[in-house]
Amino acid sequence: MSTTESIKVENLSEDILRSMPEALIFADLDGIIRLWNPGAETVFGFTAAESIGQSLDLIIPERMRKAHWDGFNKAIVRGGTLPGRTSMITRSLHKSGEPIYVDMSFAMVKNPAGQMLGSMAVARDATARFQEEKNLRRQLAELTPKPEQPEQ
């Protein structure tokens, strides 16, 4: 039997979810977390037991919640995200209470009949990269000559 034949397709999606280093989160149409893989635990610090059944507010900073839910609800009504708005770097919350930056990709999930089921997100911790880019921008600003101010 070949290796390909020995892979049980029905278990493959579970193996992929468990093995991927990125966070994979699925929330239903009410914004309740229904799937939280081990990568999500690594990125956000919450276990699946702490997350499943909770609102996405668990990982959304309070000041960003209105914008998040406005976008979430519009995507449900529209039947998907707008082109070009499927990926972004945004702030999120870690279990420690510390803000983190995540590089997040979104998709609305539909069943084969086209019925909207909820949304999924794949996220990577981008905090170190964001801080490094911020430091590089600051250094560049310090090295860039400023226009001379006219004497008064």
Locate each region found by the language model.
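Sensory modules in modular signal-transduction proteins
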Residues: 6-35, 39-41, 84, 145
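Sensory-domain boundary/capping and coupling elements
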Residues: 7, 11, 130-148
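PAS/LOV-family and closely related PAS-like sensory domains
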Residues: 39, 48, 60-102, 110-112, ...
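Alpha-helical sensory/transduction surfaces in regulatory modules that relay environmental signals to outputs
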Residues: 43, 50-52, 59
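Sensory-domain boundary capping and coupling elements
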Residues: 104-106, 123
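PAS-family sensory domains
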Residues: 115-125
